[in-house]
Design a protein with these regions (language model features):
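Hydrophobic faces of well-ordered beta-strands that scaffold small-molecule active sites
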Residues: 61-63, 90-97, 127-136, 181-183, ...
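Solvent-exposed loop/turn segments at secondary-structure junctions
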Residues: 66-69, 99-101, 140, 241-243, ...
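Conserved short loop/turn motifs at secondary-structure junctions
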Residues: 57, 62-71, 96-100, 185-189, ...
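Carboxylate/His-rich catalytic cores and anion/metal-binding grooves
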Residues: 1, 100, 106-109, 119-124, ...
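Acidic (Asp/Glu)-rich catalytic clusters
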Residues: 82-87, 117-127, 205-207, 228-232
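Distinct, well-ordered alpha-helical segments
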Residues: 75-77, 106-113, 191-204
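His/Asp/Glu-enriched, well-ordered alpha-helical/loop segment
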Residues: 44, 172-182, 189-212, 216-217, ...
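Catalytic pocket of metal/acid-base enzymes, prominently hydrolases
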Residues: 1-94, 123-175
């Protein structure tokens, strides 16, 4: 189990007296959680998750934190077994994460070599692709994202998940190896660090179609959105943040000017930045229709519509859970739209999401899915 010595070894994020481990402190906890991969236990959890995917019309999922519990090979094999036994069928893209390798003391080169070994385990439906996940700042739900000036109005500060030298070293290693980079980034100070990193990588080793993706995108400035577009970045956003958090953030954290502007997707869409919408389940419901609704309506928990200039169009939101999401994963030639030569994977809905009243968008029923050309009714 976790000991007091484990907690004391963590500079920030572990309080033994309170039994509180968060952000960087989880590095002391996750390596001790191998029991989660006990076949019966893990299999039950995966069956529940796959059932949620089917109910929501999701045919492909991306795990952006493979290895976070410290036993990546066991994790990959467990996911493979669960997907292989699923009667409906799904596709799962597994993405290695920087914190796994740092916790285990691996160098960037050792991490790359290990990921190549994992790729030998790939199957048609479960694969470790040429993607790598970076971590920049803390979580938005805990108020530990890094916000630029004037920062949090109550005076507290966020956390950096990885120092700049390590962030740069791992990013450079995988960028040069031809991997697509994804970076967990929530606050606008973290967005600035993402932009600086992308500028550095492009200057050192230019690429035309790099698709480096900012993940989560809780808060950014208009100037930063302009810069993301100019650099050819993509954004995979969680629009649910605006619905569930913007009212609270509009108080003594960000204030009434910044809080309602969380998740500025309308600005990105107008600038032509490729956008995907994700749930980061269970941070948001595993429901593409709910994600569409939050991006299009921009209501908060009280039902107020705020930051309306940052609404996405319905077509833009639909693309963000289909073809544009596939593009961000580098899978646009095989999934994401119904076209000759692609896998016949799609959801069957009770109503057209482009024509129902906005307040009914998230209530559309998922009748079933078609996976690899075979229909399955919910």
């Amino acid at each position: 189990g976790v000991t007091e010595a484990d907690a004391d070894a963590i500079e920030e994020g572990a309080n033994w007296e309170r039994g509180h481990f968060y952000e960087l402190g989880l590095r002391a906890v996750f390596p001790k959680m191998g029991f989660l991969f006990e076949p019966t236990r893990y299999g039950r959890g995966m069956r529940n998750f796959l059932a949620m995917m089917h109910e929501s019309g999701v045919t492909t999922a991306a795990d952006m934190g493979t290895g976070i519990f410290g036993n990546p090979v066991a994790e990959i094999k467990a996911v493979r077994a669960a997907v292989a036994s699923d009667p409906v069928g799904v596709r799962v893209l597994l993405t290695p994460i920087i914190t796994d390798f740092m916790t285990r003391g691996q160098s960037p080169q050792e991490a790359l070599d290990e990921v190549r070994e994992w790729q030998a385990l790939n199957t048609e439906r479960v694969a470790v692709g040429n993607h790598f996940k970076l971590m920049i700042d803390g979580a938005i739900f805990s108020g530990l994202s890094q916000m630029g000036a004037p920062g949090y109005l109550d005076g507290h500060s966020g956390v950096w998940m990885v120092d700049v030298p390590n962030l740069t070293a791992f990013a450079e290693q995988f960028w040069d190896a031809g991997f697509q980079l994804h970076a967990h980034s929530n606050g606008d100070a973290a967005t600035a660090r993402f932009i600086e990193l992308l500028e550095y990588l492009l200057a050192k080793n230019p690429k035309r179609d790099h698709r480096m993706t900012l993940e989560h995108f809780a808060y950014s400035t208009e100037d930063q959105n302009r810069k993301l577009a100019a650099l050819g970045a993509a954004v995979s956003a969680n629009p649910y943040y605006h619905y569930i958090l913007s009212e609270m953030y509009s108080g003594d954290w960000l204030g009434p000017d910044r809080g309602p502007q969380m998740v500025r997707l309308g600005s990105l869409e107008k600038k032509g930045v490729p956008i995907g919408l994700h749930s980061d389940s269970p941070m948001a419901p595993l429901s593409p229709l709910t994600l569409m609704w939050t991006a299009v309506a921009r209501e908060n928990l009280s039902g107020e519509r705020t930051g309306q200039a940052e609404r996405m169009t319905r077509m833009g939101a639909l693309k963000a859970v289909t073809i544009d999401a596939a593009w961000i994963l580098g899978l646009e030639n095989s999934i994401g739209s119904i076209r000759a030569g692609k896998a016949a994977d799609f959801a069957i809905l009770s109503h057209d999401p482009l024509s129902v009243p906005i307040n009914q968008l998230r209530s559309i029923k998922v009748v079933g899915t078609v996976f690899a050309g075979i229909a399955h009714q919910n």
